[in-house]
Amino acid sequence: MSNQEPATILLIDDHPMLRTGVKQLISMAPDITVVGEASNGEQGIELAESLDPDLILLDLNMPGMNGLETLDKLREKSLSGRIVVFSVSNHEEDVVTALKRGADGYLLKDMEPEDLLKALHQAAAGEMVLSEALTPVLAASLRANRATTERDVNQLTPRERDILKLIAQGLPNKMIARRLDITESTVKVHVKHMLKKMKLKSRVEAAVWVHQERIF
């Protein structure tokens, strides 16, 4: 990002002090800039449409339109930026639900500042991000489903296997498309089919599964 314009971030959180703290942290990074902030979901959606930021940092628990409802609305807008949930909740249901409904990552608010800044850089670059403390949470979710869900990677086509490998490496659709010399829309179709065949809820869960089971 050093040879490009700074990555743009929109903050959607109902706590002014937290937004201020995140802005101060981001001000330390010359290649990321906060272009807008909203205290509720409705305002956040309006700003997201007008600003189309590279990254949206979204609180989960907000009065009125909550984070999941806001996430659904943002996904309906087909925005180009990544959407990462930023929450105090490490409950399995919250994490899995957010990822299933299209979040590109899930970060906890008690992260160390330097870890948060690193994660924001990764997310802005198109990578999936997940607080380290949440890996066991997703692993537990996978284990709970294992008894009733048998996943056989051999069900996948060669192309779907290639894409699963790249997802496990944290690559976004755009970079996968370049790597495989196919269109981004084709990648999206393959990802959808792959997740359905493997009975996985999200890209992040797919990545955790690959690493946990040492699929490749």
UniProtKB/Swiss-Prot annotation:
- What keywords appear on the UniProt entry? Activator, ATP-binding, DNA-binding, Nitrate assimilation, Nucleotide-binding, Phosphoprotein, Repressor, Transcription, Transcription regulation, Two-component regulatory system
* All residue ranges annotated as the HTH luxR-type domain in the record: 149-214
Which positions fall inside the Response regulatory domain? 8-124
A Pfam family matched in the record: Response_reg
Task: Please list the residues that carry the modification 4-aspartylphosphate.
Answer: 59
Q: Name one GO molecular function term.
A: ATP binding
One of the protein's GO biological processes: regulation of DNA-templated transcription
Biological role stated in the UniProt entry: This protein activates the expression of the nitrate reductase (narGHJI) and formate dehydrogenase-N (fdnGHI) operons and represses the transcription of the fumarate reductase (frdABCD) operon in response to a nitrate/nitrite induction signal transmitted by either the NarX or NarQ proteins.
The protein's name in its UniProt record: Nitrate/nitrite response regulator protein NarL
Report the source organism: Escherichia coli (strain K12)
Q: What is the lineage of its organism?
A: Bacteria, Pseudomonadati, Pseudomonadota, Gammaproteobacteria, Enterobacterales
As recorded in Swiss-Prot or TrEMBL, the protein's gene is named: narL
